[in-house]
């Protein structure tokens, strides 16, 4: 009986093993369940904690570096601002000093110009006085040579014609310079009032461009001594004056001159032409005024 029971139990075990082999191995547990079980969960938590700690340390280090750089930038900006303010203040001070120096120099320059103007006026008076003295002396010499007979006379190197005295240049000047030269001689640029005077002047100037005392720089044509132009003598070339602008020297033609044939033409006042000065005979021989 016992042996039979043992055989049945052995057979039952074999059938049980055979049944398990037919069913296969037991199903495996999910990955998350295995990770969250026991020691594995502890290790995972520890790893995440370490990773978080590393991230916090890195961020803290970077934040510290950024704050350090920000402090450096603030300090640099503060120094730059202070330096700029100091430079601006220095430039402002220098500008004030330069302005004061410029005002001082302007005052000195104005004073020097005033002194030069006064000296120039005084020099012109002395020159005119010298010219008058020279004319008076020449007339006195002429009177002595004429056995004491008193008569009006022209200065030395001046030519007498019809109660006027004429001086003919041998060099060239611009019209304004020639006009000033005649004024210093207590005379004026020649004013032609008749055909006889035209022929006289033309005879002495020859075929050379020569300035006369006629211009239209301020509007209408006029003579420098106030002689009426509209009703007076004229000897213009055909189609003159034309106030031509094509010469390339700027402006028109505002000053009159004798041409090579004696007739008149208007031209640029800056051209260096010869000129003729004229003064009245009685004026040339009068006694100089006392200063």
Swiss-Prot record:
Chief location of this protein within or outside the cell: membrane
Coiled-coil spans in chain: 61-123
Region (Disordered): 1-27
GO MF annotation terms: carbohydrate binding; metal ion binding
Residues reported to bind Ca(2+) 1: 191, 197, 278
Residues covalently joined to lipid (S-palmitoyl cysteine): 36
List of residues binding Ca(2+) 2: 216, 243, 253-254
Motif Endocytosis signal positions after renumbering to this chain: 5-8
Keywords noted in UniProt: Calcium, Coiled coil, Disulfide bond, Endocytosis, Glycoprotein, Lectin, Lipoprotein, Membrane, Metal-binding, Palmitate, Phosphoprotein, Receptor, Signal-anchor, Transmembrane, Transmembrane helix
Listed GO biological process terms: endocytosis
Stored Pfam families: Lectin_C (PF00059), Lectin_N (PF03954)
Key word Protease present: no
Residues in C-type lectin domain copies: 161-278
The UniProt record lists the keyword Amino-acid biosynthesis: no
Subcellular location: Membrane
Any one Gene Ontology cellular component term annotated for this protein: membrane
Cytoplasmic-side positions: 1-40
Residues spanning the membrane: 41-61
Post-translational modification comment from the UniProt entry: Phosphorylated on a cytoplasmic Ser residue.
Positions with biased composition (Basic and acidic residues): 1-19
Intrachain disulfide bonds: 154-165, 182-277, 255-269
Additional remarks: Calcium is required for ligand binding.
Role: Mediates the endocytosis of plasma glycoproteins to which the terminal sialic acid residue on their complex carbohydrate moieties has been removed. The receptor recognizes terminal galactose and N-acetylgalactosamine units. After ligand binding to the receptor, the resulting complex is internalized and transported to a sorting organelle, where receptor and ligand are disassociated. The receptor then returns to the cell membrane surface.
PANTHER family per the UniProt record, alphabetical: MANNOSE, PHOSPHOLIPASE, LECTIN RECEPTOR RELATED
Quaternary structure (record): Interacts with LASS2.
The name this protein goes by in its record: Asialoglycoprotein receptor 1
Organism field: Pongo abelii
Organism classification: Eukaryota, Metazoa, Chordata, Craniata, Vertebrata
């Amino acid at each position: 009986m016992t042996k039979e029971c043992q055989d049945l139990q052995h057979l039952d075990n074999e059938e049980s093993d055979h049944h398990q082999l037919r069913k296969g191995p037991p199903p495996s547990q999910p990955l998350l369940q295995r990770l969250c079980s026991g020691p594995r969960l502890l290790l995972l938590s520890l790893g995440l904690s370490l990773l978080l700690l590393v991230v916090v340390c890195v961020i803290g280090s970077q934040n510290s570096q950024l704050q350090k750089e920000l402090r450096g930038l603030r300090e640099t900006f503060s120094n730059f601002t202070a330096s700029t303010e100091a430079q601006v203040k220095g430039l402002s001070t220098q500008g004030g000093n330069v302005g004061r120096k410029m005002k001082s120099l302007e005052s000195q320059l104005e004073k020097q110009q005033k002194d030069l103007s006064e000296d120039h006026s005084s020099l012109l008076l002395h020159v005119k006085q010298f010219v008058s003295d020279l004319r008076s002396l020449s007339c006195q010499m002429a009177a002595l040579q004429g056995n004491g007979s008193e008569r009006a006379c022209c200065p030395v190197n001046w030519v007498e014609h019809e109660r006027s005295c004429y001086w003919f240049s041998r060099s060239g000047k611009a019209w304004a310079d020639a006009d000033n030269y005649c004024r210093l001689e207590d005379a004026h640029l020649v004013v032609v009032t008749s055909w006889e005077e035209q022929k006289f002047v033309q005879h002495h100037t020859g075929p050379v461009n020569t300035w006369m005392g006629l211009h239209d720089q301020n509007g209408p044509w006029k003579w420098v001594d106030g002689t009426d132009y509209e009703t007076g003598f004229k000897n213009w070339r055909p189609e003159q004056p034309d106030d031509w602008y094509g010469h390339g020297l700027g402006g028109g033609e505002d000053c009159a001159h004798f041409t090579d044939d004696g007739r008149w033409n208007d031209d640029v006042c800056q051209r260096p032409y010869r000129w003729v000065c004229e003064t009245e005979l009685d004026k040339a021989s009068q006694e100089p005024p006392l200063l």
